[in-house]
C-alpha cells in the first residue's frame, strides 16, 4: 500500500524523479504511519500480553550473554542450519527490495513505476491466504519439511520468471490488461505466496529450535536462541544495500541514481533480473542444502 502511495501519489508531485524533497516526504510519512501502527499494536495486545497467559515463564530465565550465544551456535546444529538458511534468504531479499532495484524494475524495465507498484500490491494481497495455508501445512508436516517444500516451489517460480523476462518484451507488462501483465501478476502472486509460506514455516521452526535446546540442555533460553539468530541476521543482511549499490555502480550509475524513464540497457536488464530473481534462487539453494543437514522434523518434535 505504501509503495502505491510513494510511486503513484508522491512521486509525480516531485517531478517524477527520486530527489531530496521526495525522500524527505517519504520519511515523514513513514515515521507518522509507523508511530500510529506502534500505538495500535500496543493497544491491541495489552489485554492479552500478560504473564499468566503464557506457558514456560515459570522456568528459570537465562540472561543473554555473548558466550552463551557462541556456545549455543557451536553446539546447536539445527540453529546452525537455520541461520545458514534464513540468512542466505534474507540477504537476497534485502538486496532485491532496495529502492534502486525496484526503481530499475518498475521504472526502467517495465517502464511504468506507478502501475508497477499497483501490480506489486495486487500480487501481495492474497499473501495472507498463503500464510494461513502455510501455517496449516507446517502444523501437519513439520516446520522443516514445510521450509524445504515451499523453497522448492520458490526455486521453480523464480526460474520461470527469469525465462519469462528473457522471452518477452518487459515493457509490455506496463500495458494494462495485456497478456504479459496478467502472466507477470499471476507468477508474482504465486511466488510471493510461496515466500510467505517459507516465512511462516521459519517462524515456527525458531520455536522448534527453542524446544530442542530445552530438551538438549534443560535450559529454556528463547532470548538467547532468537538473539543469536537476530545478531547474525542483522550483520549478514546489512550487506544487501552494499551489494545493490555496488552492482548499480558497475553498470555506470556512479554519480546518479537510476531514475524512472532511463534507457533499458542490457546491463540494467541483466542486473535487475539477476538481483531480483537469480540471487534469491542462490539463497533458496543454500536453504535446501542447510535443511539436508538439519534433523528436526515433525517426528523428532513429537517424540
Residues covered by each model-derived region:
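Intracellular loop-helix junctions on the cytosolic face of multi-pass helical membrane proteins
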Residues: 1-113, 268-303
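Transmembrane alpha-helix termini and helix-breaking/packing motifs in multi-pass membrane transporters
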Residues: 2-21, 237-267
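Structural signature of the two symmetry-related core transmembrane helices
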Residues: 145-164
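Hydrophobic core of transmembrane alpha-helices in multi-pass small-molecule transporters
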Residues: 173-199, 205
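Short hydrophobic/small-residue motifs within alpha-helical transmembrane segments
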Residues: 124-125, 235
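Helix-to-loop junctions at the C-terminal end of transmembrane segments
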Residues: 129-145
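Juxtamembrane helix-start elements in MFS-like secondary transporters
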Residues: 111-120, 180
